[in-house]
Amino acid sequence: MSIQEKLSTALAFHQQGQLLEAGELYREILAEDPDQVDALNLMGVVMQAAGDLEVALDLLGRATELAPDYFAPFANLGNVLQASGRLLDAVEAFETALKLNGDSPETANNLSSVQNELGNPIAGLEASERALSLIPQFPEAIINKGNALLALARPVEAVNAYREALTLAPDNARAHFNLGNAYLDLEAYAEAVEPYLKSVTLDDRNAKAWFNYANCLVELDRIDDAVGCFQRALSIEPDYVDALCNLASALQSLGQTGDAIDLLRKALISQPDSPDLHWNLSLTLLQHGDYSQGWREYDWRWKMPTFEDYRRDFDRPKWDGGPLDGRRILIQAEQGFGDCIEFCRYIPMVAAMGGEVVLECRPELNRLLGTLDGVAKRIDLGAPLPEYDVHTPLMSLPRIFNTDLQTVPSDIPYLDVPKDAILDHAVLSATGLKVGLVWAGSPTRRDNHKRSCGLQALTDLMSIERVDYFSFQVGPEASELQNDPLFAGVADIAAGFSDFADTAAAVADMDLIISVDTSVLHLAGALGKPVWGMLSTPTGFLWMNDRLDSPWYPTLRLFRQPQPGDWDSVVAEVCSALEERLAKSPQG
């Protein structure tokens, strides 16, 4: 056979998918004529299909050198360069190909794909629209258009693009996967479930699809299902660090902290300097009760993006826990009100090291913290700093004092009611068991909707007699009280609080506080008042696993959700406990 006859036969094999047979003929041709451009080009395609990208690059590179005006080798070279991760070179190859043949929708679409991969969504969108101008019903180009739109923070348009692609190619796993991603971007988690499920059904070897599907299920509190999906992702990619991390978080939510710790330690072998992994490990260790290691890992919080607002530059050294010998130490309260109330218990211990303590705190806590032993001076957060010698963040003190479960400082009360605090007359005139209520946490917390039970969940409490209820609820949720006649008997005293000193005065006069996980719960515990905490599942790491008490607050009793979102069971248990208390001691 002549070279041309061999080429025709090889091309027929190639088009029928018989790549081995085609490859043999291409080799024969190149043995006879090493510069046969068509054979170089097509053999390059065969070698890419075989996974030998280096040989493919060599063949296609020679073809483009021999025929610089030939479209096909440049288009195919772009594909191999993209597969090799040489994305900028791939862009150059595709753009050269399009200069030679501007009517190639496939090449324009491939250029869109690589531009999106490079993080150039504007160029990616332009290239996909060029492809679609040539073939309007081109599913892959529509998908790439959606990817560009999603990267440009235009998720609604991306959803429409993916849906359009799916009308043309309903079994395209990538379109279903990306539609799920767009819904995830919109925080439309319920809508994301179906496309993710369809995606992993069509392509069950896509680890990223299983991973994103699992993340979606976590947001919907379907933690058990999410665990299975994370495990599927890891069965495909055992060293998928993000999947290891998120599976650990899911297991932590389920209270399986031992397994979660093992996963995080495995992930840290691959990424030993990952702030995310160390931060999650710290929370998991603390929830597990391993305080000695957990508080050491907790210092990684300063490398987390979520702590950026708390990071500060100081011109004095950090305190290492050694004797202070009369030096002035600046302690910065950090994170939420409840965190400050809980961990300010360490300040008398700092003062006992021989130092003069200056406490920087949020203004709402300033008066209350004036009752804390060991504080020489208080300043509001944001005010000019006085002179100081060393400093430390408040929540580094458990590590500095080597706190473990047996050495948690639990002498209460460690806070008191300031003498100038104002008490509402409604509290003074109450005759029944005085019970304070809080049904929602801080609206600035991402998980607040899970931690908060809502006023309606407390309906059954209203039928219990000989109880005077008082609302300690602040923020937007406080208005729920005025909008529901069922709760007309609840006195709203929180509106009169100017700061936590006034809150403390009211808490001190209660017989019992019933609260979700929020600052009032911590305040009641710090004041030594009986307090019942209603906890969501998952819950805060400091409440540990399954415990109904806490080493931090001896007067605290915990009521836990048996399943995520199940506030009915929690409130039913609280009602039974309250009736039992009334039966034993009607006066509280």
Language-model-detected regions and their locations in the chain:
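Alpha-helical solenoid repeat scaffolds of the TPR/TPR-like class and their adjacent stem/linker regions
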Residues: 1-512, 517-588
